[in-house]
């Protein structure tokens, strides 16, 4: 008989790095979740842009179960068929010629930064070690990636931090140009800053970074952990902008809810990562890669990408209607199904309160800082779920505007 647990047990037993919602989800289907009490929620959070095909998708369950009935793990001393098939699918679908599999976005970014440093050291010299990143970015929680993130809140308690990392202002090419020089080995950037407020890069900004990297022989890394695998209406956001990076990192939606990450690059850059220079025990395991292969099969189609663009329009239309009623947002922005509602000054700092009130109304949303409510729903969310979920979100906005919301 399984142990009966409650939300209070989290506070008793877990390291307190999170403050989870007061309810515990126990079952999901598509874009809906149910908690221990049987209450239904429409999920516009998507596990933070992870559940690209919703919960318990039949094809993903089938892929997982089929591989689970064969074998689960061998370690990196052996390869496996699902990993090789997934690598070929990613290569065929992108600019990449080589793939490194890992378990998360942080690990993918760690690998990308290490590759960039090693490539520069091997081809030029150890002096070429500088990394330029951007303020308010998010690249993961390892010491290297959290240092690149440019959010002191996440890194200041862990000094001394890795050296030679500098931060420019996002979408400001002059700021970046002032930092990128011949000693720069890499520039790492999110095509849309997710945690930083759902801020899409301008095309001119990314094109300018490409030109600066070419001029100074630095590698351009696109962190597509949040924007990748169909989220923006293209398989990867670099395709939306027409700017090709040297290295791309992907995770989150790649596994549709099963942990996996990957670093994609060209043969030339990958060649410096010789045996023993980097590795992972679980990366590229057959369970994860079998599921991810099925995710790509479903998402990498014109029908799915066109559907994302149509659902984007539906969200924008309804969010604008909500804003006409309540006047809470100064801007509604984003690409595809990664959207952010920026709060007016009157409601500054209340994004978390809105998210809490939304959950009470039966819809799950995210925040991106204190002033932005973020949406990252499943890419196959239905029209009915969009309508019902945003009706519930409107109710939360109404309650907050009326002063009836509380932090409880």
Swiss-Prot record:
Q: In which pathway does it act?
A: Amino-acid degradation; L-arginine degradation via AST pathway; L-glutamate and succinate from L-arginine: step 3/5
Q: Which UniProt keywords apply?
A: Aminotransferase, Arginine metabolism, Pyridoxal phosphate, Transferase
Query: What cystine linkages occur within this chain?
Result: none
Cofactors (names): pyridoxal 5'-phosphate
- Judging by the UniProt lineage, the source's domain of life is Bacteria
The enzyme class is transferase
The transmembrane segments are: none
Cross-referenced InterPro entries? Ac/SucOrn_transaminase_bac (IPR017652), AcOrn/SuccOrn_fam (IPR004636), Aminotrans_3 (IPR005814), Aminotrans_3_PPA_site (IPR049704), Class-III_PLP-dep_AT (IPR050103), PyrdxlP-dep_Trfase (IPR015424), PyrdxlP-dep_Trfase_major (IPR015421), PyrdxlP-dep_Trfase_small (IPR015422)
User: EC annotation?
Assistant: 2.6.1.81
Question: What Pfam families would the database entry show?
Answer: Aminotran_3 (PF00202)
GO MF terms listed in the record are: identical protein binding; pyridoxal phosphate binding; succinylornithine transaminase activity
> What SUPFAM superfamilies has UniProt attached to this entry?
PLP-dependent transferases
Residue positions where N6-(pyridoxal phosphate)lysine is found in the record: 252
Record's catalysed reaction(s): N(2)-succinyl-L-ornithine + 2-oxoglutarate = N-succinyl-L-glutamate 5-semialdehyde + L-glutamate
Q: Which biological process, per GO, is one annotated for this protein?
A: alpha-amino acid biosynthetic process
Main role? Catalyzes the transamination of N(2)-succinylornithine and alpha-ketoglutarate into N(2)-succinylglutamate semialdehyde and glutamate. Can also act as an acetylornithine aminotransferase.
Family, according to the entry, reads as follows: Belongs to the class-III pyridoxal-phosphate-dependent aminotransferase family. AstC subfamily.
Protein name in the entry: Succinylornithine transaminase
**This protein's encoding gene:** astC
